[in-house]
């Protein structure tokens, strides 16, 4: 049963974001080949035109377009052939009226010409005469000087995540290095007397650490650096020391375990000990992920995550990812969620008063995408392995019906 006083995830997130200090993240300068998916820290203004000259988009002949007007296969035009444009060289000639110059794809348009006619529409008559079988208009088959980027134009704006094509544009205007925001550093602390490392033999009552490896992959995929602080016993002073150290060498602190009510619940108390404002919420109207703790200490977000793997992944998506966006330099800009539209293949129930995040697998059948619920408790890692994404059931709904269209947030 969910307490109606619990915050919805979006409202809980807003408490953390609003409590964080303002200011720009630190920056660094990188070669463009190392800047993929990094966040630009400054606007990039081109110091030159791209292209730096008018050039042909096809193999053909540079001409005065007017000399071809009316030309067709049954009534061709005839032009003298006197010059040839060479790749990588500026033409040292001018195309006079009534003449053409042979030009390759990418070749610089010679002075006097204003269009290029394709090879397929030209018939050689002799070494110095060609037959034009189709007319062209001024600018046909030509990329003009500065048509792609003009000198003084803002090519990329600060706060943008660099894609491969953006890096190509930088290279095209001669930019070889770029100022970007530094990757945020996230410390992760695993707590629990029952947690052991993956290479340890299991004794009765013990489980291997799953969450630190899952979160490390998620953090890396989202432009940050994860520092795993190891496994800390359920001891107040040990956990406090680990959090204190993490606040000194990282931008965000994540603690796994110690969030459910019980004798060994120390996370909230320790966060409050770290300084104002401390814990901002303890528990959210969410499944899985109800025991989530959110706070800010020493100007840095400190989050207590549920120990169940599925809950950890959901909480990363709802809380950690948006906060990382801010720390990465995206500020309050919305991030793009990879999603697909699908049709629910089966009914799925949900309790009233909470936001339910259902793991689903997606299959294509008869030309449409179907979303199949992946059933299982949030402590089962295989429910994530078998799933392709999440479908959100809003707090106001009691479930989803088979045949209902849904949005699947892809992992």
Question: PLM ranges: what are they?
Answer:
Residues 35-49, 90-102, 294-295, 299-301:
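Short, hydrophobic/aliphatic alpha-helical segments
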Residues 1-10, 176-305, 309-315:
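Helix-rich terminal scaffold detector
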Residues 10, 23, 28-33, 42, ...:
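Flexible glycine/proline-rich
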Residues 5-70:
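Intrinsically disordered, low-complexity, positively charged segments
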């Amino acid at each position: 049963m969910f307490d109606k006083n619990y915050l919805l995830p979006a409202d809980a997130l807003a408490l953390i974001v609003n409590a964080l200090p303002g200011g720009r993240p630190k920056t660094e300068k990188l070669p463009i080949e190392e800047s993929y998916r990094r966040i630009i820290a400054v606007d990039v203004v081109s110091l030159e035109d791209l292209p730096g000259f008018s050039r042909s988009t096809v193999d053909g002949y540079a001409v005065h377009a007017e000399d071809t007007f009316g030309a067709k296969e049954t009534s061709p035009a005839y032009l003298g052939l006197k010059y040839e444009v060479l790749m990588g060289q500026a033409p040292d000639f001018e195309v006079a009226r009534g003449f053409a110059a042979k030009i390759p794809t990418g070749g610089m348009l010679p002075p006097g010409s204003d269009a290029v006619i394709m090879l397929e529409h030209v018939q050689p008559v002799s070494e110095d005469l060609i037959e034009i079988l189709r007319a062209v208009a001024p600018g046909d088959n030509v990329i003009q000087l500065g048509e792609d980027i003009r000198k003084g134009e803002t090519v990329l704006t600060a706060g943008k995540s660099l894609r491969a094509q953006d890096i190509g544009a930088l290279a095209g205007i001669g930019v070889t290095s770029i100022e970007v925001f530094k990757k945020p550093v996230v410390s992760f602390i695993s707590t629990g007397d029952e947690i052991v490392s993956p290479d340890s033999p299991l004794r009765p009552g013990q489980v291997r650490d799953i969450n630190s490896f899952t979160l490390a992959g998620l953090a890396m995929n989202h432009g940050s650096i994860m520092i795993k602080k190891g496994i800390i016993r359920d001891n107040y002073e040990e956990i406090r020391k680990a959090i204190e150290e993490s606040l000194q060498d990282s931008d965000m602190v994540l603690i796994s375990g110690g969030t459910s009510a019980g004798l060994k619940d120390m996370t909230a108390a320790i966060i409050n000990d770290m300084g104002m404002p401390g814990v901002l919420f303890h528990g959210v109207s969410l499944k899985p992920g109800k025991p989530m703790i959110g706070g800010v200490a020493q100007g840095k977000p400190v989050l207590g995550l549920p120990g169940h793997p599925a809950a950890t992944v959901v909480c990363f998506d709802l809380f950690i990812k948006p906060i990382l966006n801010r720390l990465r330099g995206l500020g309050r800009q919305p991030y793009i969620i990879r999603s697909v539209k699908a049709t629910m293949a089966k009914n799925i129930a949900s309790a009233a008063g909470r936001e339910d995040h259902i793991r689903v697998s997606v299959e294509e059948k008869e030309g449409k995408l179907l979303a199949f619920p992946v059933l299982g408790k949030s402590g089962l890692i295989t429910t994530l392995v078998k799933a392709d994404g999440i479908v959100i059931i809003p707090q106001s709904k009691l479930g989803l019906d088979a045949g209902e269209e849904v949005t699947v947030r892809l992992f």
